[in-house]
């Protein structure tokens, strides 16, 4: 059984040192963690994942290399993944019990500690941009559902029909789950259907850290279920004083443990390195029965990519 499973936590990291200022720039991304059956992870599909992740991180890296902000790098990097059918975010997101897509995203600016998030949106092409707009153009941190969609329209974000997000792969996945008469956390493509969530953390030449995360949530979800992604401190956190974090995993457990903030607090207040802090936070999730992973980037440009699942693909 185990031999028929491939564990994946697709993650990439790029680091560089600017010659003029010697300030380090860095960017790290993930495309989700989980367990994929061997028959579903063909060499061609694996190559597609890797190429898309490489494309995404190159976009963000070029922004940083040219002196751009970590915020811009995170947003544009996540756009690439949201626009791809490969990931559980934007186009290609998992479907709710009624066959529609409901999307969540969050963003945090480590310089100002400003943050924004949207939850349960159904017509915003790039939810990460909506999250940033909430941060920049509203007095709020989190907007949901119809209100978030109205706000996105008011600020001029691109809107699309819900059918844009729906792919045959996800329709088949939902049908398979519903035929088993279960609100499944696991599915035939990826063990945790939230895995596939995308995230990015970046450090720019000015020492500013930004973090963002985007997801379609959980396949066959009901009743407006929300996970950790739109919850600042659970799925996303950033603070220039310590680090930035983007998480992927069993959202209910990440909310209960406030995983992203917990990592930042352990670094900030106990002076732990990001590897130690990540391990402690994820072990707490595991102790409660949850699993998942995080990418963490600290103010020095050091990176940690940790998980408490059975394995990790890098």
Predicted regions and their residues:
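Alpha/propeptide regions of enzymes that mature by internal proteolysis
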Residues: 20-314
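Bacterial Sec-dependent N-terminal signal peptides
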Residues: 1-23
């Amino acid at each position: 059984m185990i031999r028929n499973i491939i564990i994946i936590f697709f993650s990439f990291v790029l680091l560089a040192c600017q010659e003029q200022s010697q300030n380090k720039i860095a960017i790290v991304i993930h495309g989700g963690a989980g367990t994929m059956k061997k028959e579903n992870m063909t060499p061609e599909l694996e190559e597609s994942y890797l190429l898309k992740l490489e494309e995404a991180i190159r976009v963000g890296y070029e922004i940083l290399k040219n002196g751009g902000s970590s915020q811009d790098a995170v947003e544009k990097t996540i756009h690439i993944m949201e626009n791809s059918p490969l990931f559980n975010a934007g186009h290609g997101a998992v479907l709710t019990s009624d066959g529609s897509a409901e999307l969540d995203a969050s963003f945090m600016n480590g310089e100002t500690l400003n943050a924004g998030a949207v939850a349960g949106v159904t017509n915003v092409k790039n939810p990460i941009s909506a999250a940033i707009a909430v941060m920049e153009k509203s007095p709020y941190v989190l907007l949901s559902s119809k209100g978030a969609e109205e706000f996105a329209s008011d600020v001029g974000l691109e809107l699309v029909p819900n059918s844009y997000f729906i792919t045959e792969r996800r329709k088949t996945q939902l049908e398979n789950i519903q035929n088993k008469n279960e609100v499944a956390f696991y599915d035939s493509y990826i063990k945790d259907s939230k895995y596939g969530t995308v995230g990015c953390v970046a450090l720019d030449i000015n020492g500013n850290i930004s973090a963002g995360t985007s997801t379609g949530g959980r396949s066959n979800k009901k009743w407006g279920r929300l996970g950790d992604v739109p919850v600042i401190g659970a799925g996303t956190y950033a603070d220039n004083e310590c680090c930035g974090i983007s998480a992927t995993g069993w959202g209910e457990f990440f909310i209960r443990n406030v995983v992203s903030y917990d990592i930042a607090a352990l670094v900030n207040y106990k002076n732990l390195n990001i590897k130690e802090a990540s391990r402690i936070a994820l072990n707490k999730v595991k102790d409660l029965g949850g699993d998942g992973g995080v990418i963490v980037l600290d103010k020095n440009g050091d990176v940690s990519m940790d998980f408490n699942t059975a394995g990790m693909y890098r």
